[in-house]
Each structure stands twice: as structure tokens, then as C-alpha cells.
Amino acid sequence: MQRDVTAHLELSVTEPADLVVAIAVSTHYQPSDEAFTALLDGAPVAATEFTDHSGTRFQRLQVGTGSLVIDYRAHIDGEGAQAPGVPYDLFSSRLPSRYVESDVLSPTAAAEFAGIEPGADLLAAVSSWVGTQLSYVPGASGPTDGAVETLLGRQGVCRDYAHLCAALLRARGVAARVAAVYAPGLAPMEFHAVTEAWIDDAWRVVDATALAPRQNLVRIATGRDAADTAFLTVLSGRTDLDVIEVTAVVDELARDDVTQLVSIR
């Protein structure tokens, strides 16, 4: 399997800014070709890369005012490494978080999934339920909406589906987290978000939107929710995102069998 991914961001920096982007593929991959560039009014800007314990790669940029253009590309041959079951992740992924209010949704999870033990059957049931209960409506949710708002509104985008799946799984005692990915086959193409749950001693991915085959996903960032996996975080100053373009292609697009357990590789 060969995959190519790219990301192009154009930002207007109206106040000197300190910002972090997470658009590079995670440390689970070893790209045979990869490049990250940042230009402020055409001049190169140095980026400082750091990683977290889950393999997410962040690039930090400190820039003055002007037009900032960020480009990333990577070519990946074969599969990436399997994500390990780090003890801290298995602990933190059981707890409520900013956008995954599993404690609030515990009664809902108990009522909807009563009698289904934690495992593959519960994972399939939650993903199917979320996929049928929600409508995919771009612009229907805001950046501060969590799983509760999504359930009440019954609509959202990929991150909302991922948050609600994670919340219901955590409420039933399953470690669940959110992953930002490149998703070959996704239309319209953009950064995508999915849910991972610890099932049968491995992180298994579900995508309640069913918009792209799970077998071809490329991991970017992993965390409790979108607060950990956002592609752009402005620490100080002000920037406006003017343009975002994402591509993700694979030499052979998989046919996804939703009854099968799949891991992001």
C-alpha cells in the first residue's frame, strides 16, 4: 500500500503570534519522502518540532504579522506501526474530557446499550447507533460543542461523531479516544476525525460517518478529544485561517467491512 498526503494552509497573522500546527503524520510512520515548509510573506520561517507520548508531531511557529503559508507532504510505503496500549492512555481514555462528557451521557449509554458487554459487539453497536442518530451537516456545530450538544442537536461533522462515539463507549467502561487522520476516499476532502477503542488488546478504529475506508487512514494526532488533536492552535496573538486544502490518496482504495475490527496503520 502506498499513500500520499498533503496539507496547505494560508493564514493572515494580524498580531505577532505563537502557534502550533499538527498536520504531519505521526511517529508510527517512516515516510520515504516528507517536507514541511512555512513562509511568512515569502520568507522561510523556522519551525520547532516536538512530540507527545502518543506519537503526535507538533510544529511550533513564532511569527510576526503578515501572510503565513504552511505546506506539508508525505509519501508512505506500507503500513505504519501498531499503536501500543500505553497504561496512561488506557486510564485517561476512560475519563470524561472537555468534549467527551461521558459522565453526563452515562444514563443514555446505559439505556441504549443495556445488555451489551464491553467488546467488539458494543463497539459496533455504538458506531451504528451514532451513525443512524446523527445527520452529517457541515457548519451545524461550533468549535466549543461537545458530545452532549451533538446528541441534543442530532447533527454535526466528523469530530462530533467521534466525540459522541467516544463518550458513549467511555460511559460503558471502554477506553476510547479520538484520532485526527488523513482519509483517502473522503469527499469532500479535509482533515478527518475518528474514534479508537481498546478492544481485544488493540486500538480499534470506528468511523460512524462511514465516509472513508478505515484500512487506508493515516494517523496524524491522537488524544482525549479535539483539544488534543486540533490541526491549528494559536497560543498567543491573532491569526485568521483563510485557506485550507488537504489531499490524501492511496494506490488501491479498500472496501471497508464494518463488521471487521480494524486498527489505524
Please give the residue ranges for each predicted region:
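Intrinsically disordered, low-complexity N-terminal segments that are enriched in acidic
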Residues: 1-79
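Residue-level signal for pocket-adjacent positions within structured domains
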Residues: 45, 56, 90, 146, ...
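Generic structural hydrophobic/aromatic packing signal, biased to beta-strands
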Residues: 21-23, 36-38, 72, 109, ...
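Glycine-rich loops and low-complexity Gly/Arg-rich segments
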Residues: 32-36, 45-48, 62-64, 95-99, ...
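Hydrophobic/aromatic-rich core segments of domains that either
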Residues: 128, 160-240
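Secondary-structure boundary elements
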Residues: 13, 70, 76, 80, ...
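Short intrinsically disordered coil segments
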Residues: 24-26, 85-92, 209-213, 235-236
